[in-house]
């Protein structure tokens, strides 16, 4: 009886020390359900997205939007009109950033690299930028109080 108990203990210790082998494969980070409803205010704050295809343990086609605040993810139905609109917005935004990044040059100044914009005209129209003075009542009141002191 003692020999049988000793064999079970040895087998138990060897099983605990042996590395675990997972037959399931790689862990997949995927959406299992859609967030509903997703507001346009949330979708336009996303900084990027990716399309989830149906494969492996991910059994739902989805658009995963990555939000900058607290590294949150929002899963949307890729057939939804708001989700498609947000994907087009992000594609256009990334295209503009890629063009701006293409127009930069890197100069080596000592141990630090400095990026400098090219001397060419900017591709962004001036209508994209709002006037900071007219957009905020606080800025207007600051200008009035600064001018009254003259």
From Swiss-Prot:
Q: Name one GO biological process term.
A: chemotaxis
Subcellular location per UniProt equals: Secreted
Q: Which domain of life is it from?
A: Eukaryota
Q: In which tissues is it expressed?
A: Specifically expressed by thymic dendritic cells. High levels in thymus and small intestine.
Q: Which InterPro entries match?
A: Chemokine_b/g/d, Chemokine_CC_DCCL, Chemokine_IL8-like_dom, Interleukin_8-like_sf
Q: Where is the signal peptide?
A: 1-23
Task: Report the Pfam families cross-referenced here.
Answer: IL8
Q: Which SMART domains match?
A: SCY
A Gene Ontology molecular function term of the record: CCR chemokine receptor binding
Q: Which GO terms describe its cellular component?
A: extracellular region; extracellular space
Q: Which family does it belong to?
A: Belongs to the intercrine beta (chemokine CC) family.
* Protein role: Potentially involved in T-cell development. Recombinant protein shows chemotactic activity on thymocytes, macrophages, THP-1 cells, and dendritics cells but is inactive on peripheral blood lymphocytes and neutrophils. Binds to CCR9. Isoform 2 is an antagonist of isoform 1. Binds to atypical chemokine receptor ACKR4 and mediates the recruitment of beta-arrestin (ARRB1/2) to ACKR4.
Q: Could you tell me what this protein is called?
A: C-C motif chemokine 25
Species for this entry: Homo sapiens
Encoding gene per record: CCL25
């Amino acid at each position: 009886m003692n020999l049988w108990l000793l064999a079970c203990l040895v087998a138990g210790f060897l099983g605990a020390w042996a590395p675990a082998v997972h037959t399931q494969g790689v862990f997949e980070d995927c959406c299992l359900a859609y967030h509903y409803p997703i507001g346009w205010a949330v979708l336009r704050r996303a900084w990027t997205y990716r399309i989830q295809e149906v494969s492996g343990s991910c059994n739902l086609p989805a658009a995963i939007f990555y939000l900058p605040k607290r590294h949150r993810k929002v899963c949307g139905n890729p057939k939804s009109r708001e989700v498609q609109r947000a994907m087009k917005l992000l594609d256009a935004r990334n295209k503009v950033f890629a063009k701006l990044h293409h127009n930069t040059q890197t100069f080596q100044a000592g141990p630090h690299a400095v990026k400098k914009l090219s001397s060419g005209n900017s591709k962004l129209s001036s209508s994209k930028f709002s006037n900071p003075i007219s957009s905020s009542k606080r800025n207007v009141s600051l200008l009035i109080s600064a001018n009254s002191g003259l």
